[in-house]
Amino acid sequence: MTIPILICDDSGVARKQMAKSLPAGWDVEVNFAANGQEAIDMIHQGLGDVLFLDLNMPVMDGYQTLEVISKEELPTVVIVVSGDIQPDAKKRVIGLGAFDFIKKPINSDELTAILQKTGLYAETDEPAQAAAPAVDRAASHQGSISMFDAFQEVANVAMGQAADLLARLLDVFVLLPIPRVNLLEISELQMALQATEDNDTYSGVCQGFIGSGIAGEAFLLFHDSSFKDMAKLMRYDGKLNELVELELLMDVSSVLIGACIKGIAEQLDIAFSQGHPVVLGQHVNVGDLLSNNNWRWTKTLAIEICYSIENYNINCDLLLLFTEDSLPVFRDKVAYLI
């Protein structure tokens, strides 16, 4: 009997990759949702006996979706598929009723093993002939997927890997956003930063990276109001001063920049060499941190990730800027996702 399954993810790239990862012999009808609210509506329509659920989405995220499914006792088996691989993420979704958790990028063998545990799929010597074409048609019905969708999904996975490292280091839960990806003129970037200035001051670090025809700079902009709680998490009991704050800044930037750049490199199957970190400034307005940078290009692919830590006043922005010359190579490297 054909099983209706539902793939819920705000990324068209992720939905397509999830559909292509399904076992070839599984007799299914594949449906798609872009957020949790759409998924709930489709489950009510009988279109999701199995739900593959992302966590970080607009409108209704994965955690909220699981809460609704539990409250309404909806008839669906939920398998969370996410780039948020923090230990607490898996614990939380299992606690909310998910059957299992699988990390992005998806490992097909791991997915098959989980599906076998549900009892809704069993490998056979003679796979169903119509199943694979049906899955392929469903994936193709996602329509055209832009390069920016692919860039965003690569950033999403790398963001989760960096958050996992920070969460394990500090024994916290890192709140993750949806990465923002834009192609900007450098002048537009500077104007955008000035427009977002608030009453807080920032301290910043910059680190360059290069490899296989792709180059750029990573900026960590740390809210100065976050130093007190960060010192507490790092178990520093002394008086805060600029030297201590600089040490905390360098520690956090090493984790987030290093892990995020490594996560992107692994997905592109390349290796980046990283330069020495450079302190941009301490206790200044966000626009001033980047105003003195000698830009060597006119356009940039900008990826912005805003990290925060649950139950602590800790916020920092990771800004990855790829050079204009890197874009053709970057496009070629992510073409497999489209």
Could you tell me what each predicted segment is?
Residues 12-31, 71:
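Two-component/phosphorelay signaling modules centered on CheY-like receiver
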Residues 32-41, 61-65:
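Helix N-cap/capping motif at the beta->alpha junctions
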Residues 47-52:
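Active-site beta3 strand of CheY-like receiver
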Residues 57:
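Receiver (REC) domain active-site loop signature in two-component systems and cognate sites
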Residues 89, 124, 131-244, 249-338:
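Composition-driven recognition of glycine/serine/threonine/acidic- and proline-rich low-complexity segments
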Residues 104:
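A Lys-centered signature of the CheY-like receiver
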